[in-house]
């Protein structure tokens, strides 16, 4: 059996069964409840397919027990564990940027993001800011625009996880 799968990628295992008794029809079933992301298809010709696409919440080990039964009730069992490996998911911004500032009034926006990968550490940066804005350790950009700053300004904010997954927010 194929015992490794990767998050977000289709897992497929072709099942081929046989019986020494000629003419016996074989039925392939799961002897245990399959993980929600897995589907067992019995093709009706002594073959079947175990397939599915695991998601982030499926990372880890999953016990599978398959059973093939002939017309006489005789059966055989195949047991194995499928280990689903994590794929890095990029962080996403959960805060909505404030895109308008008022002349001579303080502007402040704190970036907030999340990452579905457990344990990922996030790093916030502001690689493109106008001169009147500053970025601090609390992931906040702030400043007070003057009359000289009236107009549109490109602002680019980034959040990166420790596996180089990145999200960008442009204001």
Where are these regions (language model features)?
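Extracellular ectodomain surface segments
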Residues: 1-27, 76, 80, 89-123, ...
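Extracellular Ig-like/FN3 beta-sandwich strand-entry sites
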Residues: 10, 59-63, 106, 150-154
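Proline-centered linker/hinge motifs at extracellular inter-domain junctions
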Residues: 38, 88-92, 130-133
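Short beta-strand segments within Ig-like beta-sandwich modules, predominantly Fibronectin type-III
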Residues: 40-45, 134-137
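Extracellular/luminal low-complexity segments enriched in Ser/Thr/Pro
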Residues: 49-59, 140-150
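Extracellular and select intracellular beta-sandwich modules with Ser/Thr-enriched
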Residues: 62, 74-80, 153, 165-171
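Short, solvent-exposed loop/turn segments at the edges of extracellular beta-sandwich modules
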Residues: 68-74, 159-165
